[in-house]
Amino acid sequence: MNYSIIFYIIGWILNLEAAFMLPSCLVALIYQESSGWSLVAAVLLCLLIGLPLVIRKPKNRVFYLREGFATTALCWIVLSCVGALPFVLSGYIPNPVDALFETVSGFTTTGASILTDVEALPHCLLFWRSFTHWIGGMGVLVFLLTLIPLAGGSHMNLMKAESPGPSVTRLVPKVKSTAKILYMIYMVLTIIEIFLLLFGGMPLFDSITLSLGTAGTGGFGIKNDSIAGYSTYCQVIITIFMILFGINFNAYFLILIRKFRQAWESEEVRAYLLIIAAATLAITFNVRGYFSSFAQAFQQTIFQVASIITTTGYATTNFDLWPEFSRTILVLLMFVGACAGSTGGGIKVSRILILLKTVKKELIQLLHPRSVRRIQIDGKAIEHEVVRSTNVYMGVYIFIFAFSMLLIALNNFDLITNFTAVAATLNNIGPGLSLVGPSGNFSMFSDFSKLVLIFDMLAGRLELFPLLLLFVPNTWRRF
Protein backbone atom coordinates (compact mmCIF):
# COMPACT_ATOMS: atom_id res chain seq x y z
CA MET A 1 0.00 0.00 0.00
CA ASN A 2 1.40 3.40 -1.03
CA TYR A 3 0.40 5.44 2.04
CA SER A 4 2.16 8.62 0.95
CA ILE A 5 0.02 8.99 -2.19
CA ILE A 6 -3.15 8.32 -0.16
CA PHE A 7 -2.35 11.14 2.30
CA TYR A 8 -1.43 13.37 -0.65
CA ILE A 9 -4.84 12.82 -2.27
CA ILE A 10 -6.64 13.35 1.06
CA GLY A 11 -4.76 16.64 1.41
CA TRP A 12 -6.00 17.73 -2.01
CA ILE A 13 -9.55 16.74 -1.09
CA LEU A 14 -9.42 18.87 2.08
CA ASN A 15 -8.11 21.88 0.16
CA LEU A 16 -10.77 21.33 -2.46
CA GLU A 17 -13.46 21.15 0.22
CA ALA A 18 -12.21 24.46 1.62
CA ALA A 19 -12.66 25.99 -1.84
CA PHE A 20 -16.13 24.44 -2.16
CA MET A 21 -17.17 26.05 1.15
CA LEU A 22 -16.29 29.57 -0.02
CA PRO A 23 -19.55 30.14 -1.98
CA SER A 24 -21.49 29.31 1.21
CA CYS A 25 -19.36 31.86 3.08
CA LEU A 26 -20.28 34.40 0.40
CA VAL A 27 -23.98 33.58 0.88
CA ALA A 28 -23.55 34.22 4.63
CA LEU A 29 -21.99 37.58 3.80
CA ILE A 30 -24.80 38.53 1.39
CA TYR A 31 -27.54 37.64 3.88
CA GLN A 32 -25.48 38.97 6.84
CA GLU A 33 -25.77 35.69 8.77
CA SER A 34 -23.62 35.23 11.86
CA SER A 35 -23.58 31.46 11.39
CA GLY A 36 -21.19 32.01 8.49
CA TRP A 37 -18.34 31.89 11.01
CA SER A 38 -18.88 28.13 11.33
CA LEU A 39 -18.15 27.75 7.61
CA VAL A 40 -15.04 29.95 7.90
CA ALA A 41 -13.81 27.81 10.80
CA ALA A 42 -14.32 24.65 8.72
CA VAL A 43 -12.43 26.25 5.80
CA LEU A 44 -9.48 27.09 8.06
CA LEU A 45 -9.43 23.56 9.48
CA CYS A 46 -9.41 22.09 5.96
CA LEU A 47 -6.44 24.26 4.99
CA LEU A 48 -4.63 23.63 8.28
CA ILE A 49 -4.69 19.88 7.67
CA GLY A 50 -4.77 19.82 3.87
CA LEU A 51 -1.92 22.18 2.95
CA PRO A 52 0.85 20.29 4.84
CA LEU A 53 -0.30 17.01 3.25
CA VAL A 54 -0.11 18.53 -0.25
CA ILE A 55 3.18 20.37 0.24
CA ARG A 56 4.94 17.10 1.07
CA LYS A 57 4.73 15.48 -2.35
CA PRO A 58 5.14 11.68 -2.50
CA LYS A 59 8.21 10.32 -4.26
CA ASN A 60 6.25 7.39 -5.63
CA ARG A 61 3.13 8.51 -7.50
CA VAL A 62 2.18 5.04 -8.74
CA PHE A 63 -1.45 4.47 -7.89
CA TYR A 64 -2.85 0.95 -8.22
CA LEU A 65 -6.48 -0.14 -8.00
CA ARG A 66 -6.05 -1.10 -4.34
CA GLU A 67 -5.00 2.46 -3.49
CA GLY A 68 -7.82 3.72 -5.68
CA PHE A 69 -10.51 1.92 -3.69
CA ALA A 70 -9.00 2.76 -0.28
CA THR A 71 -8.41 6.41 -1.16
CA THR A 72 -11.91 6.84 -2.54
CA ALA A 73 -13.55 5.47 0.61
CA LEU A 74 -11.28 7.44 2.97
CA CYS A 75 -11.74 10.67 1.01
CA TRP A 76 -15.52 10.39 1.19
CA ILE A 77 -15.38 9.74 4.94
CA VAL A 78 -13.03 12.70 5.55
CA LEU A 79 -15.08 14.91 3.23
CA SER A 80 -18.26 14.09 5.17
CA CYS A 81 -16.76 14.49 8.64
CA VAL A 82 -15.31 17.93 7.88
CA GLY A 83 -18.42 18.92 5.91
CA ALA A 84 -20.54 18.26 9.00
CA LEU A 85 -18.62 20.79 11.13
CA PRO A 86 -20.60 23.91 10.05
CA PHE A 87 -23.85 22.29 11.21
CA VAL A 88 -22.36 21.37 14.61
CA LEU A 89 -20.40 24.59 15.20
CA SER A 90 -23.36 26.80 14.28
CA GLY A 91 -25.56 24.92 16.75
CA TYR A 92 -28.29 24.18 14.20
CA ILE A 93 -27.53 20.43 14.37
CA PRO A 94 -25.72 20.05 17.72
CA ASN A 95 -25.65 16.23 17.71
CA PRO A 96 -22.50 15.16 15.76
CA VAL A 97 -24.18 11.94 14.54
CA ASP A 98 -27.15 13.93 13.20
CA ALA A 99 -24.81 16.42 11.52
CA LEU A 100 -22.81 13.58 9.97
CA PHE A 101 -26.01 11.90 8.78
CA GLU A 102 -27.18 15.12 7.11
CA THR A 103 -23.79 15.73 5.47
CA VAL A 104 -23.29 12.15 4.27
CA SER A 105 -26.84 12.30 2.92
CA GLY A 106 -25.80 15.42 1.02
CA PHE A 107 -22.51 14.20 -0.45
CA THR A 108 -23.91 10.78 -1.37
CA THR A 109 -26.88 12.57 -3.03
CA THR A 110 -29.33 10.67 -0.84
CA GLY A 111 -31.42 13.56 0.46
CA ALA A 112 -32.59 11.76 3.62
CA SER A 113 -32.85 14.29 6.44
CA ILE A 114 -33.07 14.39 10.22
CA LEU A 115 -34.36 17.98 10.18
CA THR A 116 -37.95 18.56 11.23
CA ASP A 117 -37.91 22.22 10.14
CA VAL A 118 -35.67 22.82 7.13
CA GLU A 119 -36.71 26.46 6.86
CA ALA A 120 -35.16 27.19 10.28
CA LEU A 121 -31.66 26.89 8.77
CA PRO A 122 -29.90 30.08 7.62
CA HIS A 123 -29.33 30.61 3.89
CA CYS A 124 -25.61 29.82 4.09
CA LEU A 125 -26.22 26.36 5.59
CA LEU A 126 -29.11 25.68 3.21
CA PHE A 127 -26.76 26.50 0.33
CA TRP A 128 -23.97 24.30 1.72
CA ARG A 129 -26.48 21.49 2.24
CA SER A 130 -27.59 21.67 -1.42
CA PHE A 131 -24.06 22.24 -2.74
CA THR A 132 -22.93 18.95 -1.18
CA HIS A 133 -25.33 17.26 -3.63
CA TRP A 134 -23.68 18.91 -6.60
CA ILE A 135 -20.18 18.09 -5.33
CA GLY A 136 -21.03 14.44 -4.71
CA GLY A 137 -23.18 13.97 -7.81
CA MET A 138 -20.43 13.66 -10.38
CA GLY A 139 -17.85 12.69 -7.77
CA VAL A 140 -15.31 14.84 -5.97
CA LEU A 141 -12.41 12.62 -7.05
CA VAL A 142 -13.51 12.88 -10.69
CA PHE A 143 -13.20 16.66 -10.27
CA LEU A 144 -9.80 16.19 -8.63
CA LEU A 145 -8.61 14.22 -11.67
CA THR A 146 -8.81 17.43 -13.71
CA LEU A 147 -6.36 19.15 -11.34
CA ILE A 148 -3.56 16.84 -10.19
CA PRO A 149 -0.92 14.84 -12.08
CA LEU A 150 -0.64 11.12 -11.28
CA ALA A 151 1.55 8.39 -12.73
CA GLY A 152 0.57 5.82 -15.36
CA GLY A 153 -2.99 4.53 -15.20
CA SER A 154 -3.56 6.07 -11.76
CA HIS A 155 -6.31 8.37 -13.00
CA MET A 156 -8.30 5.40 -14.31
CA ASN A 157 -7.90 3.53 -11.02
CA LEU A 158 -9.40 6.49 -9.13
CA MET A 159 -12.22 6.87 -11.65
CA LYS A 160 -13.07 3.14 -11.48
CA ALA A 161 -13.34 3.34 -7.71
CA GLU A 162 -15.74 6.29 -7.67
CA SER A 163 -17.77 6.11 -10.88
CA PRO A 164 -21.22 4.48 -10.68
CA GLY A 165 -22.05 1.41 -12.75
CA PRO A 166 -20.63 -2.00 -13.63
CA SER A 167 -17.87 -0.56 -15.84
CA VAL A 168 -16.20 2.75 -16.70
CA THR A 169 -15.98 4.04 -20.27
CA ARG A 170 -13.41 6.54 -21.48
CA LEU A 171 -14.97 9.20 -23.71
CA VAL A 172 -11.53 10.09 -25.06
CA PRO A 173 -8.15 8.30 -24.72
CA LYS A 174 -7.01 10.40 -21.74
CA VAL A 175 -8.89 9.85 -18.47
CA LYS A 176 -8.11 13.41 -17.38
CA SER A 177 -9.80 14.76 -20.51
CA THR A 178 -12.77 12.43 -19.92
CA ALA A 179 -13.19 13.91 -16.43
CA LYS A 180 -13.11 17.45 -17.84
CA ILE A 181 -15.74 16.63 -20.48
CA LEU A 182 -18.03 15.04 -17.87
CA TYR A 183 -17.81 18.06 -15.58
CA MET A 184 -18.35 20.46 -18.48
CA ILE A 185 -21.59 18.67 -19.44
CA TYR A 186 -22.58 18.60 -15.76
CA MET A 187 -22.04 22.34 -15.30
CA VAL A 188 -23.75 23.36 -18.54
CA LEU A 189 -26.90 21.34 -17.74
CA THR A 190 -26.97 22.82 -14.21
CA ILE A 191 -26.70 26.40 -15.50
CA ILE A 192 -29.43 25.81 -18.10
CA GLU A 193 -31.78 24.56 -15.39
CA ILE A 194 -31.06 27.58 -13.18
CA PHE A 195 -32.00 29.98 -15.99
CA LEU A 196 -35.15 28.05 -16.91
CA LEU A 197 -36.32 28.12 -13.28
CA LEU A 198 -35.59 31.85 -13.07
CA PHE A 199 -37.64 32.32 -16.24
CA GLY A 200 -40.55 30.65 -14.42
CA GLY A 201 -40.45 33.24 -11.64
CA MET A 202 -38.57 31.19 -9.04
CA PRO A 203 -36.33 33.33 -6.76
CA LEU A 204 -32.60 33.24 -7.54
CA PHE A 205 -31.57 31.48 -4.31
CA ASP A 206 -34.25 28.82 -4.78
CA SER A 207 -33.32 28.33 -8.45
CA ILE A 208 -29.66 27.76 -7.64
CA THR A 209 -30.13 25.46 -4.64
CA LEU A 210 -32.82 23.33 -6.29
CA SER A 211 -30.80 23.06 -9.51
CA LEU A 212 -27.78 21.90 -7.50
CA GLY A 213 -29.98 19.25 -5.88
CA THR A 214 -31.47 18.18 -9.21
CA ALA A 215 -28.09 17.97 -10.93
CA GLY A 216 -26.68 15.74 -8.21
CA THR A 217 -30.00 13.85 -8.04
CA GLY A 218 -29.91 14.60 -4.33
CA GLY A 219 -33.25 16.00 -3.26
CA PHE A 220 -32.53 18.36 -0.37
CA GLY A 221 -35.22 21.02 -0.56
CA ILE A 222 -35.13 24.41 1.13
CA LYS A 223 -38.83 24.32 2.05
CA ASN A 224 -40.61 21.99 4.45
CA ASP A 225 -42.98 20.93 1.66
CA SER A 226 -40.07 20.18 -0.72
CA ILE A 227 -41.20 21.25 -4.24
CA ALA A 228 -44.96 21.33 -3.64
CA GLY A 229 -45.11 25.12 -3.19
CA TYR A 230 -43.67 25.99 -6.59
CA SER A 231 -45.56 26.55 -9.84
CA THR A 232 -46.46 23.75 -12.24
CA TYR A 233 -43.98 25.20 -14.76
CA CYS A 234 -41.10 24.92 -12.26
CA GLN A 235 -42.15 21.39 -11.32
CA VAL A 236 -42.17 20.39 -15.01
CA ILE A 237 -38.68 21.87 -15.54
CA ILE A 238 -37.36 19.97 -12.51
CA THR A 239 -39.02 16.78 -13.80
CA ILE A 240 -37.30 17.11 -17.18
CA PHE A 241 -33.89 17.75 -15.65
CA MET A 242 -34.21 14.91 -13.13
CA ILE A 243 -34.72 12.58 -16.10
CA LEU A 244 -31.83 14.19 -18.01
CA PHE A 245 -29.40 13.84 -15.09
CA GLY A 246 -30.41 10.18 -14.74
CA ILE A 247 -29.14 9.42 -18.27
CA ASN A 248 -25.63 8.09 -18.88
CA PHE A 249 -23.43 11.12 -19.59
CA ASN A 250 -21.74 9.16 -22.39
CA ALA A 251 -24.96 9.71 -24.37
CA TYR A 252 -24.52 13.49 -24.12
CA PHE A 253 -20.94 13.20 -25.35
CA LEU A 254 -22.15 11.18 -28.34
CA ILE A 255 -24.72 13.90 -29.06
CA LEU A 256 -21.99 16.57 -28.85
CA ILE A 257 -19.89 14.77 -31.46
CA ARG A 258 -23.03 14.32 -33.62
CA LYS A 259 -23.39 10.57 -33.13
CA PHE A 260 -27.13 10.92 -32.54
CA ARG A 261 -28.05 7.43 -33.70
CA GLN A 262 -25.48 5.78 -31.45
CA ALA A 263 -26.75 7.79 -28.47
CA TRP A 264 -30.37 6.77 -29.13
CA GLU A 265 -29.48 3.11 -29.74
CA SER A 266 -28.14 2.74 -26.20
CA GLU A 267 -30.11 -0.17 -24.71
CA GLU A 268 -29.73 1.23 -21.22
CA VAL A 269 -31.09 4.69 -22.11
CA ARG A 270 -34.05 3.22 -24.00
CA ALA A 271 -34.83 0.80 -21.15
CA TYR A 272 -34.58 3.67 -18.65
CA LEU A 273 -37.03 5.84 -20.63
CA LEU A 274 -39.35 2.87 -21.20
CA ILE A 275 -39.47 2.11 -17.46
CA ILE A 276 -40.32 5.76 -16.73
CA ALA A 277 -43.09 5.75 -19.36
CA ALA A 278 -44.60 2.44 -18.20
CA ALA A 279 -44.48 3.34 -14.49
CA THR A 280 -45.97 6.79 -15.17
CA LEU A 281 -48.91 5.42 -17.14
CA ALA A 282 -49.64 2.65 -14.64
CA ILE A 283 -49.58 4.98 -11.63
CA THR A 284 -51.48 7.80 -13.39
CA PHE A 285 -54.48 5.56 -14.06
CA ASN A 286 -54.27 4.22 -10.50
CA VAL A 287 -54.24 7.65 -8.79
CA ARG A 288 -56.44 9.65 -11.20
CA GLY A 289 -59.20 9.78 -8.56
CA TYR A 290 -56.83 11.50 -6.11
CA PHE A 291 -56.51 14.61 -8.31
CA SER A 292 -58.91 17.10 -9.88
CA SER A 293 -58.00 16.15 -13.46
CA PHE A 294 -56.19 13.47 -15.44
CA ALA A 295 -53.59 16.05 -16.52
CA GLN A 296 -52.78 16.90 -12.91
CA ALA A 297 -52.56 13.21 -12.02
CA PHE A 298 -50.14 12.67 -14.92
CA GLN A 299 -47.99 15.69 -14.00
CA GLN A 300 -47.74 14.68 -10.33
CA THR A 301 -47.08 11.05 -11.22
CA ILE A 302 -44.30 11.66 -13.72
CA PHE A 303 -42.62 13.99 -11.22
CA GLN A 304 -42.60 11.31 -8.52
CA VAL A 305 -41.59 8.54 -10.92
CA ALA A 306 -38.68 10.66 -12.20
CA SER A 307 -37.75 11.64 -8.65
CA ILE A 308 -37.64 8.04 -7.41
CA ILE A 309 -36.01 6.27 -10.38
CA THR A 310 -33.29 8.93 -10.64
CA THR A 311 -32.97 8.72 -6.82
CA THR A 312 -33.43 12.49 -6.49
CA GLY A 313 -36.10 12.33 -3.80
CA TYR A 314 -37.96 15.60 -4.34
CA ALA A 315 -41.69 15.46 -3.63
CA THR A 316 -44.68 17.48 -4.81
CA THR A 317 -47.25 15.40 -2.96
CA ASN A 318 -47.41 12.82 -0.17
CA PHE A 319 -47.17 9.68 -2.33
CA ASP A 320 -47.29 7.60 0.85
CA LEU A 321 -51.07 8.16 0.74
CA TRP A 322 -51.38 6.70 -2.78
CA PRO A 323 -52.91 3.22 -3.40
CA GLU A 324 -50.79 0.14 -2.64
CA PHE A 325 -50.30 -0.58 -6.35
CA SER A 326 -48.70 2.84 -6.92
CA ARG A 327 -46.61 2.67 -3.75
CA THR A 328 -45.33 -0.77 -4.76
CA ILE A 329 -44.23 0.51 -8.17
CA LEU A 330 -42.37 3.40 -6.53
CA VAL A 331 -40.60 1.00 -4.14
CA LEU A 332 -39.53 -1.18 -7.09
CA LEU A 333 -38.20 1.92 -8.88
CA MET A 334 -36.06 2.64 -5.80
CA PHE A 335 -34.08 -0.50 -6.57
CA VAL A 336 -33.86 -0.05 -10.34
CA GLY A 337 -32.24 3.38 -10.15
CA ALA A 338 -30.88 5.50 -12.98
CA CYS A 339 -28.38 4.76 -15.75
CA ALA A 340 -24.75 3.90 -15.07
CA GLY A 341 -22.52 6.91 -15.71
CA SER A 342 -25.19 9.32 -14.47
CA THR A 343 -25.45 11.13 -11.14
CA GLY A 344 -28.29 8.81 -10.05
CA GLY A 345 -28.09 5.96 -7.56
CA GLY A 346 -29.78 2.59 -7.21
CA ILE A 347 -28.69 -0.74 -8.66
CA LYS A 348 -28.57 0.88 -12.14
CA VAL A 349 -30.48 -0.02 -15.29
CA SER A 350 -27.35 -1.50 -16.90
CA ARG A 351 -26.98 -4.04 -14.09
CA ILE A 352 -30.67 -4.95 -14.34
CA LEU A 353 -30.19 -5.57 -18.08
CA ILE A 354 -27.11 -7.74 -17.46
CA LEU A 355 -28.96 -9.75 -14.80
CA LEU A 356 -32.01 -10.30 -17.05
CA LYS A 357 -29.82 -11.34 -19.97
CA THR A 358 -27.86 -13.68 -17.69
CA VAL A 359 -31.11 -15.37 -16.64
CA LYS A 360 -32.19 -15.64 -20.29
CA LYS A 361 -28.84 -17.15 -21.22
CA GLU A 362 -29.05 -19.74 -18.43
CA LEU A 363 -32.59 -20.75 -19.42
CA ILE A 364 -31.55 -21.25 -23.05
CA GLN A 365 -28.48 -23.15 -21.85
CA LEU A 366 -30.77 -25.57 -19.99
CA LEU A 367 -32.75 -26.22 -23.17
CA HIS A 368 -29.69 -26.36 -25.44
CA PRO A 369 -26.69 -27.45 -23.31
CA ARG A 370 -24.25 -27.37 -26.25
CA SER A 371 -25.14 -23.87 -27.39
CA VAL A 372 -22.60 -21.11 -26.82
CA ARG A 373 -24.14 -17.70 -26.20
CA ARG A 374 -22.61 -14.44 -25.02
CA ILE A 375 -24.43 -11.64 -23.27
CA GLN A 376 -24.56 -8.55 -25.44
CA ILE A 377 -25.53 -4.94 -24.82
CA ASP A 378 -25.62 -2.41 -27.66
CA GLY A 379 -24.45 -5.17 -29.99
CA LYS A 380 -21.20 -5.67 -28.05
CA ALA A 381 -20.35 -8.77 -26.02
CA ILE A 382 -20.12 -8.12 -22.28
CA GLU A 383 -16.88 -9.39 -20.76
CA HIS A 384 -17.21 -12.31 -18.36
CA GLU A 385 -15.52 -10.20 -15.66
CA VAL A 386 -18.31 -7.58 -15.87
CA VAL A 387 -21.00 -10.28 -15.61
CA ARG A 388 -19.20 -11.88 -12.66
CA SER A 389 -18.77 -8.56 -10.84
CA THR A 390 -22.47 -7.77 -11.40
CA ASN A 391 -23.49 -11.07 -9.83
CA VAL A 392 -21.12 -10.54 -6.89
CA TYR A 393 -22.41 -6.98 -6.48
CA MET A 394 -25.99 -8.25 -6.21
CA GLY A 395 -24.99 -10.87 -3.65
CA VAL A 396 -23.20 -8.32 -1.46
CA TYR A 397 -26.04 -5.82 -1.97
CA ILE A 398 -28.65 -8.30 -0.69
CA PHE A 399 -26.48 -9.19 2.33
CA ILE A 400 -25.92 -5.54 3.32
CA PHE A 401 -29.61 -4.76 2.81
CA ALA A 402 -30.77 -7.67 4.97
CA PHE A 403 -28.18 -7.07 7.71
CA SER A 404 -28.98 -3.34 7.84
CA MET A 405 -32.69 -4.10 8.19
CA LEU A 406 -31.93 -6.47 11.05
CA LEU A 407 -29.84 -3.86 12.88
CA ILE A 408 -32.29 -0.97 12.60
CA ALA A 409 -35.17 -3.28 13.59
CA LEU A 410 -33.82 -2.83 17.15
CA ASN A 411 -35.69 0.52 17.11
CA ASN A 412 -38.92 -1.48 16.98
CA PHE A 413 -40.47 0.52 14.13
CA ASP A 414 -42.81 -1.09 11.61
CA LEU A 415 -41.50 -3.29 8.79
CA ILE A 416 -42.36 -0.84 5.98
CA THR A 417 -40.47 1.96 7.75
CA ASN A 418 -37.39 -0.23 8.25
CA PHE A 419 -37.49 -1.72 4.75
CA THR A 420 -37.90 1.58 2.92
CA ALA A 421 -35.42 3.38 5.22
CA VAL A 422 -32.70 0.94 4.15
CA ALA A 423 -33.89 1.05 0.52
CA ALA A 424 -33.88 4.86 0.57
CA THR A 425 -30.35 5.09 2.00
CA LEU A 426 -28.61 2.17 0.28
CA ASN A 427 -30.04 3.32 -3.07
CA ASN A 428 -29.37 7.01 -2.26
CA ILE A 429 -32.99 8.09 -2.73
CA GLY A 430 -34.03 10.00 0.40
CA PRO A 431 -37.68 9.50 1.28
CA GLY A 432 -39.20 6.07 1.85
CA LEU A 433 -42.67 5.18 3.10
CA SER A 434 -44.51 5.28 6.43
CA LEU A 435 -42.44 7.12 9.11
CA VAL A 436 -39.70 7.98 6.58
CA GLY A 437 -42.14 9.00 3.84
CA PRO A 438 -42.18 12.40 2.10
CA SER A 439 -43.89 14.00 5.10
CA GLY A 440 -41.57 12.31 7.62
CA ASN A 441 -37.82 12.18 8.30
CA PHE A 442 -35.12 10.05 9.92
CA SER A 443 -34.83 11.95 13.22
CA MET A 444 -36.60 9.26 15.28
CA PHE A 445 -33.90 6.63 14.67
CA SER A 446 -31.32 6.01 17.40
CA ASP A 447 -27.73 7.17 16.89
CA PHE A 448 -26.71 3.55 16.30
CA SER A 449 -29.32 3.14 13.55
CA LYS A 450 -28.26 6.44 11.99
CA LEU A 451 -24.66 5.17 11.85
CA VAL A 452 -25.90 2.01 10.11
CA LEU A 453 -27.80 4.14 7.59
CA ILE A 454 -24.74 6.40 7.15
CA PHE A 455 -22.76 3.29 6.23
CA ASP A 456 -25.52 2.33 3.78
CA MET A 457 -25.47 5.75 2.13
CA LEU A 458 -21.71 5.66 1.65
CA ALA A 459 -21.79 2.03 0.50
CA GLY A 460 -24.54 2.78 -2.01
CA ARG A 461 -22.79 5.82 -3.47
CA LEU A 462 -19.43 4.06 -3.73
CA GLU A 463 -20.93 0.89 -5.21
CA LEU A 464 -20.25 -1.17 -2.04
CA PHE A 465 -16.71 -2.45 -2.62
CA PRO A 466 -14.47 0.59 -1.85
CA LEU A 467 -16.04 0.93 1.59
CA LEU A 468 -15.98 -2.81 2.33
CA LEU A 469 -12.30 -3.08 1.36
CA LEU A 470 -11.41 -0.78 4.26
CA PHE A 471 -12.26 -3.71 6.56
CA VAL A 472 -10.07 -6.22 4.69
CA PRO A 473 -6.60 -6.56 6.34
CA ASN A 474 -4.85 -7.28 3.02
CA THR A 475 -5.83 -3.82 1.80
CA TRP A 476 -3.40 -2.18 4.22
CA ARG A 477 -0.32 -4.34 3.61
CA ARG A 478 2.68 -2.57 2.13
CA PHE A 479 4.13 -3.54 -1.24
What would you call each of these model-derived segments?
Residues 1-479:
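Membrane-proximal intracellular helices of multi-pass ion channels
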